[in-house]
Every structure is written in structure tokens, then in C-alpha cells.
């Protein structure tokens, strides 16, 4: 257990980023994530909003409890009560630690905006934070506390995103494109400030650090101005494309249903 939690440092050599152990572990998580989302989503699809929301409440409590437990272990392990400052929810995937509880516990426009935000970014964060987390799987053994908790919380983010889609909880109103982007922009601003104060790399706004962000970093030759602007620009493009793909799929499904009704 001491080795699993990393007390005194991990003695095992990391299997490596994109090793078969890494891919097997995260793929198993993704399969479980999708199956659970489909199961709960279809089960609650035709129920009232209160019944649908119970799953979000459970997801919010579980994901934040797991994260708090991780922060406690990190502080104890490092013997530094301020070690949690380097685990703030200021990455694209960890924003869900705030967004999912907002989607679960609030009402009205805040709830709708949070639901859409989780729907748009939850699955992306799950994939990016598992398959493309080179900064984790290159440093820690696959079955270590850091990677297991990270994989678990990212999977909950992806599960919640898929559940919102399948249970039809997302509003996806066009005005929420700007709301979603504004939320993300606010976190980017907070990340820039935290990076300045802590000399860290929240939201990967200082460099890719073994993630797909490296593509943008190399494209702009590591420019400290163009790189973060490029990251924010691609976030905006992703949001717009995601919304329009959603509208297209909704239109196509509606058209198919109309044709079926006409034939009958």
C-alpha cells in the first residue's frame, strides 16, 4: 500500500506514456465509463428532471470526494500543507470538479450553462486526461495512486458528459456558446494568474508538457504571447464546432423521424 500511494517516492519504474499497460488501463476505464453512461442515461431518459438529476448529484459528490482525498494524500505525502496549490482545478479536465457540482446543485440559467459546459468539455477532458496525459504516465507507474485517481475522476467527467447527452439534459441553446466560452476564458485568466504566482503551468498555457498542446506550442515556436492565444482560439473553435455538430445531428435525427412518420 505504501508503494501504491507513493509514500517515500515510487520505487517502480514507470511503464511509459502509450505503453500497453497505459493503453489497457485507460481503455478499460473508457469502456466502463461508456457502459455506465448508456445504462443510466437510457434508464432515466424518460423520467422527470429530479430523477435525472440524482445521477448528477452522485457524480458531483463522488468526483469531488475523490479529489479532496487525493489532495489530503498529496499534502501528507509531501509533508507540505500547501502542496494542494499545485492541484487547483485550473486544467481543462479538472474544471469539471466545479462544473459538475454546479450542474447538479444549482437551478435556472446557471444550471443550464453548467450542463452545457460539462456536455461540451467533459468527454474531451476524459480522453485528453487519460490517453494523452503524458505528464502523468511518463512519470508515475500506471497502477499508482496518482494515475488511478486521475483516471477515475476523468472517467467521471466523461461519464457525466455522456449521461447528460443520453438523458437529454443539455439545453444547448445558441446563446450558451458565449456563456461556455466566457466560463472557459475566466478559468484561463485564473490559470494565467496562478501560473505567474506559483511558477506553474495550469491550463498548459506555458507549454504542452507532453500533451497535444505541444502541437500549438511548436507551431508558434513557443511564443509566450501567441501560444496561450492559440490555445484559447482553438478552445473557441472547438466550442463552435461542437455546438454545430450537435445541431446537425439533432436536425438529421428529426428529419429521419419525419420521413418515418410520412411513410407510416
Regions found by a protein language model. Name each.
Residues 12-30, 179-180, 185, 198-239:
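Membrane-interface transmembrane-helix boundary segments in multi-pass integral membrane proteins
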Residues 24-42, 62-69, 188-192, 232-244:
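Hydrophobic core of alpha-helical transmembrane segments in multi-pass integral membrane proteins
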Residues 34-39, 99-103, 156-175:
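Alpha-helical transmembrane segments in multipass membrane proteins, preferentially the mid-helix core
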Residues 42-56, 105-114, 167-178:
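Membrane-interface helix-boundary motifs at transmembrane edges
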Residues 51-104:
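A glycine-rich, hydrophobic loop/mini-helix early in the fold
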Residues 63-72, 122-133, 184-193:
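Aromatic-anchored segments of alpha-helical transmembrane domains
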Residues 68-87, 137-170:
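Alpha-helical transmembrane segments and their immediate interhelical/interface regions
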Residues 99-161:
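Membrane-proximal helix-loop-helix units in multi-pass membrane proteins
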